Amino acid sequence: MARMQESADLLKCSFCGKSQKQVKKLIAGGAVYICDECIELCNEIIEEELGQAQHDEQERNELPKPSEISAFLDTYVIGQDPAKRILSVAVYNHYKRLRASETIGRRRNDEPETELVKSNILMLGPTGSGKTFLAQTLAKLLDVPFAIADATSLTEAGYVGEDVENILLKLLQAADFDVERAQRGIIYIDEVDKISRKSENPSITRDVSGEGVQQALLKILEGTVAAIPPQGGRKHPNQDFIQLDTTNILFIVAGAFSGLEKVIADRNGKKGLGFGVEVSSKKEEANIVDIFKDVLPEDLVKFGLIPEFIGRLPVVATVSNLDQKSLVKVLTEPRNSLVKQYRRLFEMDDAVLTFTDDALEEIANQALERKTGARGLRAIMEEILVPIMYDLPDRKDVGEVIINGAVARGEAEPEMLEAVAEEKTA
C-alpha cells in the first residue's frame, strides 16, 4: 500500500510523462512540470528553426544585382541584350519590393511606408527568339518556383477549357505545394497575343477565349487570394481549396504579336496598303524589334488587348529575330548548348562528335527557312544525328563522327574515323 502511495506521489513531466526518478531534473511551473530531456529537445528545435530563419535571411540579402542577373543570362542565352537589361532590372526591383514588404512595420519612426506596386512584364518578339528560355533562366538563377501556361488553352469560367486558376495550380505543383514558396514564384504566360479580342470595340457577344480570358486574368495579375482546387479542373461544391495570394507572384506575359508592327507603322504615318507600298523584305522583318520598341498602350489596344490588361503590364521588353550568326552561337556557346549536349551523348558511346563550320551554318540556315528560330534547332539536329545514334552503339570500331555541310543537307554520309584501340572499350 505504501509503494502504491509512493508511486502516486511521484511527479511526472507534463510533456513526455517520465517520472522524477527517470530524469535528472524536473522543473515546476504552476501545475506544469518539464524534464531536462524535454528542455534539451526544445532547445534543439528552436536552434534549428532559428538557423533556417537566418539562412533564409542570408539568401534574401544575397539578391543578385541587375548586372549579375544579366551576366548569368549571358551564359545561357545568346544576344537579346536590351531585353536582358530590362528583365534584369524588373526582376531585381520585384524581389527588392518583396524584401521591403517583409520589413514593413519594423521601423520605429511614424513616417508612412511607401507602397511599392508590382510591375509585371510584357515580352514582345517572334517565335523561337528565346522569350520562354529567358524566363526559365531567371527562375533558375533566383531559385524560385516557375510555371509555364499557354494562354490559348484558357477560357472564361463556365466554358469548356482551363480556368485561369489552373495556372496557379501549376505553380503550386512546381513548389511541391509549399504555399509560401509559390507566392514568391514566377508565372510565364505564352501566346497572350492569341487572346486578343476580335475587334477594338466592345461586342455584345461573348468572347470566351479572348476578352473573357483577359478579364479573368486581371485579378491574379494585380493580386488576389485565389481558391485553387488541389486536383485541378473545375470548381465544385464541398471541395477543399488551397488559398494562394498572387500579390507577390511575378507574371511574365509574352507573345509574337504578329501584325502589331503594322499598327505601329499606321500610327507613325507609314501606309500599309496600296499599289505604291513596298513589299516587306527579310531586312524589314529583321527590324521588327526596332518597330516594337516604339509600341504604345494605344497600339496594343488596337491589336486587341483591353486597357485594364495592358495597365497590369507596365514593363515591356522586346526580343529580336536571331540571324544566322546568332543561331550558330546558340548551337555552340551557351553552357548547355545543343552541340555540347550531343557531344556528351556520343562520349557515352565512346565516340567524338565533330561539327564543321559549314555544318553549323547549314543547320542555322534550315532553322531560318523554317522560321522556327532557336526552338527548331533541336529538331534539325535530331534529323541529322538519329540515324548515326541508332548504329553507333553497335559500331565499336568508330572513334569519331564528323558532320559537314553536305551531311547536314542530307547529301552525304558522315565521315567516321576508326577508333584507337586504347580509347575504345571492347
UniProtKB/Swiss-Prot annotation:
Binding-site residues for Zn(2+), renumbered to this chain: 13, 16, 35, 38
GO molecular function terms attached to this record: ATP binding; ATP hydrolysis activity; ATP-dependent protein folding chaperone; protein dimerization activity; unfolded protein binding; zinc ion binding
This protein's record includes keyword Zinc: yes
Ligand binding (ATP): 126-133
Gene3D superfamilies given in the database record: 1.10.8.60, ClpX chaperone, C4-type zinc finger domain, P-loop containing nucleotide triphosphate hydrolases
Annotated GO CC locations: HslUV protease complex
SMART domains given in the database record: AAA (SM00382), ClpB_D2-small (SM01086), zf-C4_ClpX (SM00994)
A Gene Ontology biological process term: cell division
Origin superkingdom: Bacteria
Residue ranges of domain ClpX-type ZB in the record: 1-54
Keywords: ATP-binding, Chaperone, Metal-binding, Nucleotide-binding, Zinc
SUPFAM superfamilies listed in its UniProt record: Glucocorticoid receptor-like (DNA-binding domain), P-loop containing nucleoside triphosphate hydrolases
Known function: ATP-dependent specificity component of the Clp protease. It directs the protease to specific substrates. Can perform chaperone functions in the absence of ClpP.
Assembly and interaction partners: Component of the ClpX-ClpP complex. Forms a hexameric ring that, in the presence of ATP, binds to fourteen ClpP subunits assembled into a disk-like structure with a central cavity, resembling the structure of eukaryotic proteasomes.
Family classification: Belongs to the ClpX chaperone family.
Listed PANTHER family: ATP-DEPENDENT CLP PROTEASE ATP-BINDING SUBUNIT CLPX-LIKE, MITOCHONDRIAL, ATP-DEPENDENT CLP PROTEASE ATP-BINDING SUBUNIT CLPX-LIKE, MITOCHONDRIAL-RELATED
Protein name stated in the entry: ATP-dependent Clp protease ATP-binding subunit ClpX
